[in-house]
Amino acid sequence: MTGSYLPSILVPLVGIIFPGISMALLFIYIEEENIS
């Protein structure tokens, strides 16, 4: 029963969090490069 509604929560969550993390890391990398 738990497996049926788990993907519907997990897929949007991963779709939001993963780009968010990658954008944050990219932003930090660019900022670090500009400072130095």
Curated annotation (Swiss-Prot):
Looking at the UniProt record for this protein, which Gene Ontology cellular component terms does it annotate, in alphabetical order? chloroplast thylakoid membrane; photosystem I
Alphabetical keyword list: Chloroplast, Membrane, Photosynthesis, Photosystem I, Plastid, Thylakoid, Transmembrane, Transmembrane helix
GO biological process: one example: photosynthesis
Transmembrane segments annotated in the record for this chain: 7-29
| Pfam families per UniProt | PSI_8
* Family annotation (SUPFAM superfamilies): Subunit VIII of photosystem I reaction centre, PsaI
- Which cell locations does it reside in? Plastid, Chloroplast thylakoid membrane
What InterPro entries does this protein's entry cite?
Answer: PSI_PsaI (IPR001302), PSI_PsaI_sf (IPR036357)
Q: How does it sit in the membrane?
A: Single-pass membrane protein
Q: What is its main location?
A: plastid
The protein's matches in HAMAP family, at most eight in alphabetical order, are given as: PSI_PsaI
Its function, per the record, reads: May help in the organization of the PsaL subunit.
Q: Which family does it belong to?
A: Belongs to the PsaI family.
The protein, known as: Photosystem I reaction center subunit VIII
